[in-house]
Every structure is written in structure tokens, then in C-alpha cells.
Amino acid sequence: MDQMNYQNKKVLVYGWARSGKAVYQLLKKIGANVYVTADEEPTDLFDDVNFVDDIDESFDLLVKNPGIRYEKEIIKKALNLNIPVITEVQVALDQFKGEVLAVTGSNGKTTTTTLIGKMLKADNVDVKVGGNIGIPVSELMLSDSQPRVLMLELSSFQLLGAQNIKPKIAVITNLFSSHIDFHHTRGNYLRAKFSITQHQTKDDYLVLNDSSIDSKDFAKRSQADDYYFSPTNTSVNTYVNDGTIYFDDEKIIDLSKVVLVGEHNLENILAAVTAAKIFGVSNRAIEKVLTSFKGLEHRLEAVGVIKERTVYNDSKATDIEATQKALASFKEPINLIAGGLDRGDDLNRLVPNFKNVVSLITYGQTKNKLQSAGEKAGIKQTVVVDTLKEAVAKAKELSRPGQVLLFSPAAASWDQFPNFEIRGEEFKKMIKNREGWS
């Protein structure tokens, strides 16, 4: 793809979070004339920042924070003036000379990105990991030296403003209807996701989930060489057979050696193995990672065994599909805490997944819908409360030794918490309080 020239261009950075600060510094470094705007003037602006309240025809480019909606007046004005609107990912990748590996999808992006990054590092590949995983790509480009490889997690928000991306290996973990409040339609969401492969050529690779209904369509429209993974279909590239992971019929590792738990994590592992093998990572390096990596915080995170209950924090389960995967990960009786922001999802889709749930404690905006789903599933104990604190107290009371206590909200956190991370931290604090256990 042709790279954009930023030298002497007048650029407006919209949003002053970590990514805004990083792209501001990068744009200054490469010779742009940079201005900053935000919905409210930040209190931590750098001393040399030119803050403005609006955009006009004198600007050449607007770089927005990925999460800012396109309905904002400044963005609409920029588009009406034919000023390009991009995210910091595009600015950063225009400066990068090495190979890009990128992961997107509805769920599993962060775990899959982390696994691939660790596998590359275990094989002594010079790689930096960033993107939606927490480190802005622009921040990685501030260093005077560049790595051989960038391993990136990219959200639909980032991809929508990075139309020039061309990864050597693109991974799509899965595709559900997600972030419809931002994208408005499933079609718009899928178009944003397709951006990850839109400019790939026959010399590039696209890794797809065999069970995602949109995978075949993506493969048909992409020019890249497609590879599939599946925990159930042994006719694809990366699969599981008789308790062993294979890639193109080559034995990689026995599942008994893998320490990362969860049905959904098996798909993440298969996606990571596929990308790693395409890149040329050794089986030794792959095995080293899979026999030691226990998972990320808030993603079916084992909090511990407390009063003979095994407790899991799955605060990252911000949609129905993630909670479905979490519930499928256990054979033991489950005491489930769920609830959060109501985005209009049909929570009755969880009914078939409730077969091992012995008590359901719901809170937040979705509490009544979840209780209704639980009653339809025949759960004997369904309890509605207002807050997570009350839910944890009730779960302590209802759970019994030998059972699982699972916090998997099936909803975003924003009705009561700023993000899923803070929600998960609060859950762990409440659980570790020894009071209230029956």
C-alpha cells in the first residue's frame, strides 16, 4: 500500500488518551504540524500542544481516537470538507518497515495476540506486541529502532480508520454481531473487520475460524492464502484429534500438556498455532508457551479455591458468546453471577447453556432478562439483586463445596463500572473477603 506523507501536513488529533498522546508525539517526530482537540480540554496537555476547538478547511488530516463515534460534529465536518479521518494505527504503520502480524475478531483477540507474541519471542524473533492489547502502535514507533515484526491486536474501531493495513499474516478469531451500537449494522461491523485482509495479496496469509459463518465469505473475497482452524473438524489445517493438536497433519502438542483452560481458549490456541507455524516458529517454542501460559487477567481467570469452591473471574465476557464459551468449560455444578449494561441482546440464547448452572445471581440493567432466561432453563435458584457486591454475597451463600463460582457477565460493564478491568478487580476483592461464605 502507498504510504501517506505527513511532512509539513496540518494534522488534528482528536482525543487525548494514551493513543492520542502517542500519535501526537509520532506526528511531531515525522514533521507534521500537529494540533489537538477533545470534547473537553484535557488538564494534562503537553506544554507544546496547540489546542483548538474545531476543524476547518486548512487541515489536511484528522486522526481520531478509535472509540470516538463518527457521529461527532468535528468528524462529520471533516468528512464534509473531504479531510481524511484515520486512527493512529495507520499513522504508525506508515512508518513501519518490517512485517505485520495482526489479530482481530469478536472474542479472543487479546489472548490469541499474546500467545502468538510469546511464541515468536520464544523462537528468538525480534517482535513487539501492541495495538488494542494496551500499547498504541504509535507508541511502539517512537523508538529510534524498529523490530523485525509487529504483533498487533486490532479492534473494529481501529480497523475502520486504518484502511491501508496489509499484514503478512491476518488472524480472525471469530465473528459475531458485536458493537452494533457503534457500527449500527452487522454489515458495517463485518466491513470493518474485513479491512484486515482487504489489501492482502496472494503472498500473504489469512487465518480463519472454520466454525464462523462469515469465514468462507471472507476467504472468497480475500486474495490471501487462507488457513482454517477447528477443535472439531479434522479436515482443516489446524485441528484436534484424539487429544492432540495437529497442523497440516504434523503433531504439535498433546492437550494434556496445555495449561490454558476453557473451550474458547482452545480456539485461541489453535488460531495462534496456525499463525506461528505459517511464520515458521518451531514446535519447541510453541510447546514452551503452551505448557506455561495460564491466561490473561479477567478472561476465565482462576481466582483460587476458596472454601472448597473454585472461583473464576471472567469479567471480559462482555457478550453472550463469551459467557456461552465459559459455561461450556466446566462439568462441575456452576454458581453463575451475570449482568451489566443492557444493549438489547436476546439473553434467552443462554438458556441451552445453563444446564450445569445450579444457581444464577443477576444484577445490573440485564438482571431481569437474565433471571427470565434462567427460569426458562429450569434453574432452581435464581436471585435478582442490584449490585455486583450484593451478587457476590449471595453467590457465597448459595454455592457449595466442590462447585464452581463463575463471574461471567454476558454484558458490558458501563452501567456500573468504567471498564471490564475495574469490574473484574472489584469482583476479586469481594470474593477474597473471607466474610459471608456459607
Curated annotation (Swiss-Prot):
Positions contributing to ATP binding = 105-111
Please give the function described in this protein's UniProt entry: Cell wall formation. Catalyzes the addition of glutamate to the nucleotide precursor UDP-N-acetylmuramoyl-L-alanine (UMA).
Task: Tell me which Pfam families the record gives.
Answer: Mur_ligase_C (PF02875), Mur_ligase_M (PF08245)
Query: Where along the sequence do coiled-coil regions lie?
Result: none
Q: Example GO biological process term?
A: regulation of cell shape
What's the catalysed reaction?
Answer: UDP-N-acetyl-alpha-D-muramoyl-L-alanine + D-glutamate + ATP = UDP-N-acetyl-alpha-D-muramoyl-L-alanyl-D-glutamate + ADP + phosphate + H(+)
| Protein name, per record | UDP-N-acetylmuramoylalanine--D-glutamate ligase
Q: Which family does it belong to?
A: Belongs to the MurCDEF family.
Superkingdom field: Bacteria
Q: Which residues form the signal peptide?
A: none
Keyword GTP-binding, does the record have it? no
* EC main group: ligase
Where does the protein end up? Cytoplasm
Q: In which pathway does it act?
A: Cell wall biogenesis; peptidoglycan biosynthesis
Alphabetical GO CC annotations of the entry are: cytoplasm
Chief place where the protein resides: cytoplasm
Q: Which PANTHER family does this UniProt record tie to the protein?
A: UDP-N-ACETYLMURAMOYLALANINE--D-GLUTAMATE LIGASE (PTHR43692:SF1)
Q: What is its EC number?
A: 6.3.2.9
